[in-house]
Regions:
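Short hydrophobic beta-strand segments
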Residues: 72-74, 187-190, 245
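Mg2+-dependent endonuclease catalytic cores in nucleic-acid-processing enzymes, primarily RNase H-like
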Residues: 2-15, 43, 88-216
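ATPase catalytic-site recognition across NTP-hydrolyzing enzymes
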Residues: 4-75
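Acidic two-metal-ion nuclease catalytic site recognized across multiple nuclease folds
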Residues: 104, 229-256
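Charged alpha-helix within mobile-element recombinases
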Residues: 212-235
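Short coil/turn segments at secondary-structure boundaries
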Residues: 31-40, 46-53, 134, 191-196, ...
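Short, flexible loop/turn elements at secondary-structure junctions
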Residues: 40, 77-79, 137
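Gly/Thr-rich phosphate-binding beta-strand-loop-beta motif of the actin/hexokinase/Hsp70
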Residues: 65-92
Length: 256
């Protein structure tokens, strides 16, 4: 037997005991192969091979945030079987319509903590228009609670529930495949200075997002990708329009 395929008799890291390794290999075989057998994903396996084209050094997110551009947030909430929440904040250049991620927050927060994090986002980004929050049933209680306590959550009127589904994810224009088109056309400006130089297993919001987008759909985690998509949906619905193209020379994007 190829020794690479064997599970170690003694786990190399207590965070991944033998039983967890076996479960990971059974439930996420491609992710296991990438993470524990060092078999890299090919471009044909990735949904977003053009993502690195958007990496732009020298962008200071604080400067972008202070420009007063329309800002949108997507929120992927934890569920009964999945811990962790992600808040993804994007500013949109009203002239070129290019999208600039300016803040990515991750945390294992309870409902009041999620609300507090959103309040902080609303305070830091006064031009925040919409907070698009995933709603698959379990999260509805949080959404209702935020809207029913406007005194405590003064951003309540900006919260909109978004229901995900397979058809939404695979739609070539509005779903995740459409995001690859936007990456290819450099409609997103990714501030690479936020994560370049970080250690390989850095768990900051930026590094986790870059890994998840790079490995999607084969990676074990996808929370940041979905929060990114919810922010994109907020832009499409309440922003300046849907991106349909951008010239290689940097011309303004069209809308429809």
């Amino acid at each position: 037997m190829n020794p690479v395929m064997k599970l170690p008799s003694v786990p190399v890291w207590s965070h991944w005991p033998t039983e967890r390794l076996r479960e990971e290999k059974e439930t996420n075989p491609r992710s296991y192969s990438r993470g524990f057998e060092q078999r890299a994903f090919s471009d044909s396996e990735r949904m977003f091979p053009s993502f690195p084209l958007c990496f732009t050094p020298g962008i200071v997110t604080g400067d972008i945030a202070r420009r007063g551009w329309p800002t949108f947030a997507g929120v992927d909430l934890s569920g009964p079987k999945r811990r962790g929440n992600v808040i993804f904040v994007v500013a949109v250049d009203p002239l070129s319509q290019r999208r600039y991620p300016i803040e990515i927050l991750r945390g294992d927060w309870k409902s009041p903590e999620v609300a507090a994090q959103l309040a902080g986002v609303n305070t830091r980004h006064p031009n925040l228009r919409i907070i698009m929050v995933e709603n698959n049933g379990y999260q509805q209680a949080l959404i209702d609670w935020i809207k029913q306590t406007p005194g405590e959550n003064q951003y309540w009127f900006k919260v909109e529930a978004y229901t995900t589904g397979f058809e939404t994810k695979v739609n070539p224009t509005y779903g995740l495949p459409g995001l690859e088109v936007e990456f290819k056309n450099k409609a997103w400006v990714v501030p690479s200075s936020e994560f370049e130089g970080h250690p390989p297993h850095c768990s900051c919001g930026w590094c986790v997002w870059v890994r998840e987008v790079t490995d999607y759909p084969m990676g074990a985690e996808q929370d940041s990708v979905m929060a990114h998509q919810f922010a994109r949906e907020a832009i499409s619905k309440w922003g300046t329009g849907i991106t349909v193209g951008v010239a290689q020379g940097g011309a303004s994007l069209g809308t429809r």
